[in-house]
Amino acid sequence: MSTIELNKRQEHILQIVKENGPITGEHIAEKLNLTRATLRPDLAILTMSGFLEARPRVGYFYTGKTGTQLLADKLKKLQVKDFQSIPVVIHENVSVYDAICTMFLEDVGTLFVVDRDAVLVGVLSRKDLLRASIGQQELTSVPVHIIMTRMPNITVCRREDYVMDIAKHLIEKQIDALPVIKDTDKGFEVIGRVTKTNMTKILVSLSENEIL
């Protein structure tokens, strides 16, 4: 089933190109008794969506791809930089109590921990904070660096990475978020985050044809 809803005219255009391609826009317009200008938006949608390919001085070709294939092609091209969120960062000497408050107030599931040089040194998840709160420790006096997951046991990503690869990391590592980092002389600077929520938003945008 196609993930992109086409109107009757667009379906008719596809059928014409299937049967006559390669075919120019002018010839398609003639077969529909319409002007080339009238068809321009429909041809643009079909081309950007991947149903058709256009070559200068040759015309339009039918790609033969299904809606599922087109969706997969789009997903493979999406990069982290276009969908990353703002990270929530705390200092490594912050107390576990304050970290819990920050997580609640910011409404996030993962906190990224940095040192005094703003370099990534750890990650705190809900599970880490829950585990600490169940214990007998005084949460206001225990710094987060005691309970956090430390480098180099942290999976990171960069702005140029592909969304599909990040989705696989989230599933394989069973984690909710990855820090988006930038390399510096001192280490990794956190410049963003990618979460399971980001992935859900991408799928919704694709289903509503907001990503072409």
UniProtKB/Swiss-Prot annotation:
Domain CBS: 83-139, 148-211
DNA-binding region positions on the chain: 23-42
Molecular function per GO: DNA binding
Record's keyword terms, sorted: DNA-binding, Repeat, Repressor, Transcription, Transcription regulation
Signal peptide: none
GO terms of biological process kind: carbon catabolite repression of transcription
Gene induction: Constitutively expressed.
Description of the deletion phenotype: Relieves catabolite repression of gapB and pckA transcription. Disruption is epistatic over a yqfL deletion.
SMART domains cross-referenced by the UniProt entry: CBS
Pfam families in the record: CBS (PF00571), HTH_11 (PF08279)
Highest taxon, organism lineage: Bacteria
Domain annotation HTH deoR-type: ranges: 6-70
InterPro entries: CBS_dom, CBS_dom_sf, CBS_domain-containing, HTH_11, UCP026546_HTH-CBS, WH-like_DNA-bd_sf, WH_DNA-bd_sf
Main function: Transcription repressor that binds to the promoter of gapB and pckA genes, preventing their expression. Acts as a regulator for catabolite repression of gluconeogenic genes.
Stored PANTHER family: CBS DOMAIN-CONTAINING PROTEIN CBSX2, CHLOROPLASTIC, TRANSCRIPTIONAL REPRESSOR CCPN
Protein name: Transcriptional repressor CcpN
Gene, per the UniProt record: ccpN
